[in-house]
């Protein structure tokens, strides 16, 4: 029995949900998201709640039940409030700037790194050493943040690199003489 799957997804006012077979489409003030639910899950709308139920007791149905409920809840939250990820650039000469819709980052390479924003995701640079990534799709926001961090991850000796806001970097002691 999935404890997460049993909970109903509350639908706030201003959000419109369309069920078309196994496809769920959520429309709200921040945009529109759609996702196809696994065949093992039944979805129904009762008033201002969305209920998901596993069709049988198979292991796959139980595992998809909680996942499906969480993904639908994330879609509802995404079209109402959206998701945001903040990255910090730590290091001498590490800075970011906007060039149109693209992000240009200087990370100590011989060239600038240019990152294009995927559909539905926006970049903002409030400070030269800070990048804000926002969008309605939690997966897309997290994926582009991870791709930017992967360009120059924080190194353990000086802590230089791209890190998530508030991320603690494990530091190592240098060589001893």
From Swiss-Prot:
It comes from the Bacteria. Gene3D superfamilies: Ribosomal protein L6, alpha-beta domain. One of its GO terms (molecular function) is structural constituent of ribosome. One of its GO terms (biological process) is cytoplasmic translation. Keywords: Ribonucleoprotein, Ribosomal protein, RNA-binding, rRNA-binding. InterPro entries: Ribosomal_uL6-like, Ribosomal_uL6-like_a/b-dom_sf, Ribosomal_uL6_a/b-dom, Ribosomal_uL6_bac-type, Ribosomal_uL6_CS. SUPFAM superfamilies: Ribosomal protein L6. The keyword rRNA-binding applies. Residues 157-177 are annotated as: Disordered. GO terms for cellular component: cytosolic large ribosomal subunit. Part of the 50S ribosomal subunit. HAMAP family: Ribosomal_uL6_B (MF_01365_B). This protein binds to the 23S rRNA, and is important in its secondary structure. It is located near the subunit interface in the base of the L7/L12 stalk, and near the tRNA binding site of the peptidyltransferase center. PANTHER family: 60S/50S RIBOSOMAL PROTEIN L6/L9 (PTHR11655), LARGE RIBOSOMAL SUBUNIT PROTEIN UL6M (PTHR11655:SF14). Belongs to the universal ribosomal protein uL6 family. This is Large ribosomal subunit protein uL6. It comes from Caulobacter sp. (strain K31). The gene is rplF.
């Amino acid at each position: 029995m999935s404890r997460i799957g049993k909970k109903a997804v509350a639908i706030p006012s201003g959000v419109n949900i369309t069920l078309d077979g196994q496809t769920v489409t959520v429309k709200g003030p921040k945009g529109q998201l759609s996702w196809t639910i696994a065949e093992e899950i039944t979805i129904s709308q009762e008033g201002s709640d969305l209920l998901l139920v596993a069709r049988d007791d198979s292991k796959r149905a139980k595992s998809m039940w909680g996942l499906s409920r969480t993904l639908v809840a994330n879609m509802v939250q995404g079209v109402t409030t959206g998701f945001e990820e903040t990255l910090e650039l730590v290091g001498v000469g590490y800075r970011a700037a906007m060039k149109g819709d693209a992000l240009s980052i200087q990370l100590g390479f011989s060239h600038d790194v240019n990152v294009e924003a995927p559909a539905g995701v926006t970049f903002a640079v409030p400070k030269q050493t800070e990048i804000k990534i926002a969008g309605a799709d939690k997966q897309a926001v997290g994926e582009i943040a991870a791709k930017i961090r992967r360009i120059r991850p924080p190194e353990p000796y000086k802590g230089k690199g791209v890190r998530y806001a508030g991320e603690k970097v494990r530091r190592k002691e240098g060589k001893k003489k």
